């Protein structure tokens, strides 16, 4: 049976939804090992629920964008004999696997939404208008996988208590091979109880129509356990951080539910959210392009509509 190496650059006390999806996908492709920059003890504790046989970690804590992670990845792949390597399609995951592909002279497919037992990957392209199938010749085969591509039922059925994996510590050079990159300072983002935008199963997004006031959307997001997104117009206006931008030049999301409020739906914005399973659009302009792709549309002022949604959700929870 083939060996699948899952790259989790840094593990917290528990795994994220995107990491669990990646592990669930890997279990259907072969025996699973994990390569991580987290300490061996913490990694083994966090992965006791997954069918992971071995965890490869460095002799010191590593986290992106430390280029030594690529040294760890390379050594872990060689040590495990993995013929498939998976990472989440985040900037850090894609960067690490792209560098690894160069070192190993291997093929890489990025932003896949599914991988079958034969190694064929499906990709959603051209803002979700088409699905393509691609395959890598030779081994190892490297893939990054878009968050929210593996459904919740598959994750729950594939993962369960499986015992503590074996830990293997690999030596990593103090300085990555000729990287020229030095991490001088780390500044954590302001903490939030909301899920990460690219991993969230529900996203509430606002645009020019919020006119600088995201509070009404934050109330809705709180009721739904959702992440907050925004159009480029909203981030350029300084109403919300650019990290919340959804679109061609921002974050690409594929949630189960995407609520668009006060966003016209220009093609650049649609490119970042069109693959959502269900799209709800709220806009005063009945001719707004967003209604062309919406599953449900509400023509109205978001400041009238959204509070009614919040109230209905609260009543439903209390009943």
At which residue positions do the language-model features occur?
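N-terminal glycine-rich FAD/FM-binding segment characteristic of electron-transfer flavoproteins
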Residues: 1-319
């Amino acid at each position: 049976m083939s060996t699948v190496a899952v790259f989790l650059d840094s593990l917290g006390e528990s795994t994220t939804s995107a990491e669990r999806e990646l592990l669930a996908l890997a279990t259907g492709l072969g025996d699973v090992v994990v390569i991580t920059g987290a300490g061996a003890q913490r990694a083994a504790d966090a992965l006791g629920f997954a069918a992971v046989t071995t965890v490869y970690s460095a002799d010191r804590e590593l986290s992106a964008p430390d280029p030594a992670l690529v040294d760890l990845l390379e050594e872990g792949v060689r040590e495990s004999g993995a013929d498939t390597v998976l990472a989440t399609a985040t900037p850090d995951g894609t960067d690490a696997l792209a560098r690894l592909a160069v070192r190993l002279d291997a093929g890489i497919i990025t932003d896949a939404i599914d991988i079958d037992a034969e190694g064929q990957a499906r990709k959603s392209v051209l803002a979700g208008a088409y699905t393509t199938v691609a395959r890598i010749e030779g081994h190892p085969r490297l893939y990054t996988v878009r968050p929210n591509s593996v459904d919740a039922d598959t994750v729950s059925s594939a993962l369960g208590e499986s015992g503590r994996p074996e830990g293997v510590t690999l030596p990593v050079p103090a300085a990555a091979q000729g990287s020229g990159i030095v991490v001088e300072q780390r500044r954590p983002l302001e903490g939030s109880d909301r899920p990460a935008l690219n991993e969230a199963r529900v996203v509430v997004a606002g645009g020019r129509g919020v006119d600088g006031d995201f509070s009404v959307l934050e109330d809705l997001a709180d009721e739904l356990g959702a992440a907050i997104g925004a159009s480029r117009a909203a981030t350029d206006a300084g109403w919300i951080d650019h990290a919340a931008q959804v679109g061609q030049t921002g974050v690409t999301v594929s949630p189960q539910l995407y609520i668009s409020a006060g966003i016209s739906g220009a093609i650049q914005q649609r490119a970042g959210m069109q693959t959502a399973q269900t799209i709800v659009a709220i806009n005063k302009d009945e001719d707004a392009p967003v209604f062309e792709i919406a599953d449900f549309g509400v023509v109205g002022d978001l400041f009238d509509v959204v509070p009614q949604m919040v109230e209905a959700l609260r009543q439903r929870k209390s009943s």
